[in-house]
A protein has these predicted regions:
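FAD-site-proximal beta/loop scaffold in flavoenzymes
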Residues: 1-61
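A short alpha-helix-loop-beta-strand transition element characteristic
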Residues: 11-13, 60-70, 96-101
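A generic short alpha-helical patch detector that favors 3-5-residue windows
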Residues: 22-25, 63, 141, 154
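Solvent-exposed alpha-helices and their adjacent loops that cap or buttress functional pockets
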Residues: 24-25, 29, 67-68, 113-115, ...
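Short amphipathic alpha-helical segments
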Residues: 29, 71-72, 133
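Rossmann-like dinucleotide-binding cores of NAD(P)H-dependent redox enzymes
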Residues: 40-47, 53-90
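Flexible, glycine-rich terminal cap/loop adjacent to redox cofactors
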Residues: 58, 77-190
Length: 190
């Protein structure tokens, strides 16, 4: 507020600066990243926006804008909460026919051994293509685990590829695998 934006070609949407996928505003040579551009208000999103913006300004080739549905959301509490992509509701609203898998940490050997078996992992897939639409987690170290699904989404990995991925044992990440298997009625340990 009151920084002179009204004298520029910068556009606002509900108080946030409108940018293209590279941080450029409507005013030539003026860029914006981070919280001023709107949700999600996450440090890792802002940091990545800064990198993309600088790469674009520097004229680098193959700069990829952020896809909002691929930004991981993490809440650092106990139990931890993490997510990426669409929720079941949003996927249905977008017209997807979905498959959903869930796996509780109380059935994961590593979580039991750690004495931290509260929570679960849920995965949401496009029933037609097998695309991973979203993943949601509550439990031990899920703010670390979510990156596996972020990478899977960014590489456009399907459920078949995730089902055939070998997850080390005993690890918390095995719950990720079991959640994928559960979406296709193939869970092993629950």
């Amino acid at each position: 507020e009151n920084i002179g934006l009204e004298a520029t070609k910068v556009k606002l949407d509900r108080g946030h600066i409108v940018t293209d996928g590279y941080g450029a505003t409507g005013e030539a040579g003026l860029y914006a990243i981070g919280d001023v551009t709107g949700a999600p208000w996450l440090a890792h999103k802002a940091s990545h926006e800064g990198i993309i913006c600088i790469e674009k300004i520097a004229g680098m080739k193959h700069v990829h804008p952020i896809e909002d549905n691929s930004v991981p959301g993490c809440t650092y509490c106990r139990p931890q909460v993490a997510s990426v992509g669409l929720t079941e509701t949003k996927a249905k609203q977008a017209g997807y026919e979905i498959k959903v898998g869930k796996f509780p940490f109380l059935a994961n050997g590593k979580a039991i051994a750690l004495g931290d078996d509260e929570g679960l992992i849920k995965t949401i897939f496009d029933a037609k293509t097998g695309a991973l639409l979203g993943a949601h987690m509550i439990g031990p170290e899920v703010t670390e685990l979510i990156q596996g699904y972020v990478v899977a989404r960014s590489l456009e990995t399907t459920e078949a590829e995730l089902m055939h991925t070998i997850f080390p044992h005993p690890t918390l990440s095995e719950a990720m695998h079991e959640s994928v298997l559960d979406a296709y009625d193939r869970a092993i340990h629950f």
